[in-house]
A protein has these predicted regions:
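Active-site anion-handling motifs in enzyme catalytic cores
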Residues: 1-271
Length: 271
């Protein structure tokens, strides 16, 4: 390193100092997911919350990504963000992985998917049945919150999407919470309190199934159609009459954990 002595003080040459800073700025893994809004599912779905991939930092899609050995994008319904990031923003990432992102059949057939596939080392989707794309459910299933969930204290609870529930019929006296309220721990505790869970939230649906609760899903778009075993569904105005049809789906939690662990091992083999 070049050292300059000026007036009795030590100064490092500017060029060498910049190199030194870049060396120490290097992280092992950049986890990139949607962080701009207070959506509990978006914050909970990054695999960085559950898997050890070395020294890491979390970033939103709008942030600059520093030099890193690995960039992990996802999860969440963020396909367009992923296309942009893998095309323009990840030049300093040695390896790139898309983990459990919502990818529809239309997305899969798009030029955007071709760009993602060409720019990434591994690509997976939380959507079941997408041809040519590995199925890996949302990594939030790895949370230990599902291992010690409380027993139900209500017959039915309503877990709503904070921005998509205006047309949702309400039932007087039914406990209700939305996906912009508190942490994942708060959400799972509330969802677990219902023997039956009515929800129009993707993660509300997923977490209720992971908990083994009966679920009645009130979808607002097609992303709810791609679970490995879809829940019973109802419309926003007639769901109270359909509560009796709610069903549980067996094996959702262990299956999700196995598939995430297997994908984690593939990621480890990259680095």
């Amino acid at each position: 390193m070049q050292i300059l002595r000026i007036g009795g003080s030590l100064f490092v040459g500017i060029r060498n100092l910049c190199c030194w800073k870049r060396f120490f700025a290097l992280i092992d893994t950049a986890f990139i997911h949607r962080r701009a809004e207070n959506n509990v599912g978006d914050f909970a779905c990054t695999p960085g919350n559950y898997f050890d991939l070395g020294r890491h930092e979390f970033f939103g899609f709008s942030q600059e990504i520093p030099s890193c050995n690995l960039a992990v994008l996802g999860g969440g319904q963020v396909f367009r963000d992923v296309v942009n990031s893998t095309t323009y923003d990840l030049g300093r990432a040695k390896k790139r992985v898309v983990w459990g992102v919502g990818i529809s059949p239309k997305d899969r057939a798009s030029v955007g998917y071709d760009l993602v596939e060409g720019n990434c080392d591994l690509v997976s989707t939380r959507n079941w049945g997408i041809e040519g794309c590995e199925y890996v459910p949302c990594a939030s299933a790895m949370s230990p919150l599902f291992d010690n969930a409380p027993e139900p204290t209500h017959d039915v609870v309503l877990f709503g999407h904070a921005k998509k529930s205006d047309k949702l019929v309400r039932v007087s006296g039914m406990p209700e919470q939305n996906n912009h309220s508190g942490t994942m721990a708060d959400a799972v505790k509330f969802i677990a309190s219902g023997a039956t869970v009515v929800t129009n939230s993707f993660h509300g649906t997923y977490w209720a199934m992971c908990l083994g609760r009966k679920v009645l899903c009130v979808p607002f778009n097609r992303k709810f159609e791609f679970f490995r075993e879809n829940p019973v569904m109802a419309s926003p105005d007639d769901w109270p009459d359909q509560i009796k049809n709610a069903e549980r789906r067996e094996g959702v939690l262990p299956n999700a954990r196995v598939l995430n662990q297997q994908f984690y091992e593939k990621v480890q083999n990259l680095i």
